[in-house]
Amino acid sequence: MTCYYAGDFETTTNEEETEVWLSCFAKVIDYDKLDTFKVNTSLEDFLKSLYLDLDKTYTETGEDEFIIFFHNLKFDGSFLLSFFLNNDIECTYFINDMGVWYSITLEFPDFTLTFRDSLKILNFSIATMAGLFKMPIAKGTTPLLKHKPEVIKPEWIDYIHVDVAILARGIFAMYYEENFTKYTSASEALTEFKRIFRKSKRKFRDFFPILDEKVDDFCRKHIVGAGRLPTLKHRGRTLNQLIDIYDINSMYPATMLQNALPIGIPKRYKGKPKEIKEDHYYIYHIKADFDLKRGYLPTIQIKKKLDALRIGVRTSDYVTTSKNEVIDLYLTNFDLDLFLKHYDATIMYVETLEFQTESDLFDDYITTYRYKKENAQSPAEKQKAKIMLNSLYGKFGAKIISVKKLAYLDDKGILRFKNDDEEEVQPVYAPVALFVTSIARHFIISNAQENYDNFLYADTDSLHLFHSDSLVLDIDPSEFGKWAHEGRAVKAKYLRSKLYIEELIQEDGTTHLDVKGAGMTPEIKEKITFENFVIGATFEGKRASKQIKGGTLIYETTFKIRETDYLV
């Protein structure tokens, strides 16, 4: 039997050594009983208090598996792991080579305790969580103290109580109301898909077999996201015109519902197949030298770091030219269609994979959770439906090589990491993930191109266009796969991918400045104006983190709007 808890730490901001100065934990089922929450003023006292609570629960109920969630285990977990290593406390943990923290586990004689990351299930802020689950409390302002205080103020206890209560409510919704069994949203979605798929008397591996390592690697050389495409013509200009913003309704679920997707073991060809079948899908390895046609949007992202460096771009950028270099590209038939339309290119076909397709693979799953989302009787049911709809496709492309981080303390007692040996993980079926994103990208770029004269910016699932009565878009406020009008701006400025500002019209007719910038804190965004939003501008207040003695220090540094070499 499993019993769930929620926890939180407040830590000092001393640049030499950090420590937990306030902690709180609570049983998830008691999320609304703040008088039962346990508060402590050191990490050691937190662990002692938690152990006593677990031991009492085990004695009373027989529950022998305890899981406590922290909302960002990478931060809070660094204090735990540092403490365990410093005190020779045996634990197991899983941190991958990308620095993503999943769990820390302690084994006791009668029960186990695992610290887990709630962000893997509820991937949004505590403040957002309070609104989603309609809680009568709101997240406050984090108290930042350089040193551990001698006296704990009541408002600080109130603050941490609220944080833990909101997190506990979110976990209660997922694990008690909606019966989650996994600890990442993607794993939960795949488990549920397999359950529904079995109902149709079909075997998962008959359609999604384990691919040969070379074939799987070929597919993964293609995988890129839907991407963000900024304007070519209006970059850096302040635009004083009406701008409309459109979002695709449930883009990835709609793509899975409305399109055939690959199945089975693909055929492999040298070069290009003599016959291209309309009901089959293809991944092409080509070598190409290319330049963007006049009046067309770029569609190519350079995935290989070496190739990207050769032509002076980042791997996330769309590019306009190969600069007379011959570049290796891995393109689906959807990507190739755009490439040939948008670029003047010299191409040599090196190798091709050909897939059979099936058109109803995900219909039962998507329609089930579409209905649940549209007819949800509770915030928990609606949130689970959204998670199920949006988390499945990516799991098909999950990494097959797992590299764990090994933690150790350096000679100053600071937590450090090194990579462990590689481990192979059984793949799901990468072609599904790559074709879902490829089809979605084809849809977005094609719609952007059809509205070329009005185009300003394409985000993962949205278009930003000059207001016009002649836009070519299939618009519906709710229908899957169609464009919903999400907002209107009276003024805007687009610098590059993930970096733009728009003065949006609110429901009451007033306007507010919406600032998008990866790495910008809310405090930095408040300083942004149309005048100072320029390449090269710097702003104080960017948050960064580093390991120091005791755990993770969050500190402020300078945010700079950087120029890039890329040509979009």
Curated annotation (Swiss-Prot):
The reaction(s) catalysed by this protein are: DNA(n) + a 2'-deoxyribonucleoside 5'-triphosphate = DNA(n+1) + diphosphate
Tell me a Gene Ontology molecular-function term this record carries.
Answer: exonuclease activity
The keyword rRNA-binding is assigned to this record: no
Q: Which domain of life is it from?
A: Viruses
EC number(s) stated in the UniProt entry for this protein: 2.7.7.7, 3.1.11.-
- Which InterPro entries does the record match to this protein? DNA-dir_DNA_pol_B, DNA-dir_DNA_pol_B_CS, DNA-dir_DNA_pol_B_mt/vir, DNA-dir_DNA_polB_phi29_vir, DNA/RNA_pol_sf, DNA_pol_palm_dom_sf, RNaseH-like_sf, RNaseH_sf
Tell me a GO biological process for this protein.
DNA replication
Protein keywords: DNA replication, DNA-binding, DNA-directed DNA polymerase, Exonuclease, Hydrolase, Nuclease, Nucleotidyltransferase, Transferase, Viral DNA replication
The miscellaneous comment for this protein is: This DNA polymerase requires a protein as a primer.
Q: What does this protein do?
A: Replicates the viral genomic DNA. This polymerase possesses two enzymatic activities: DNA synthesis (polymerase) and an exonucleolytic activity that degrades single-stranded DNA in the 3'- to 5'-direction for proofreading purpose.
- What family classification does the UniProt entry report for this protein? Belongs to the DNA polymerase type-B family.
Q: What is this protein called?
A: DNA polymerase
From what organism does this protein derive? Streptococcus phage Cp-1 (Bacteriophage Cp-1)
Q: Which gene encodes it?
A: 5
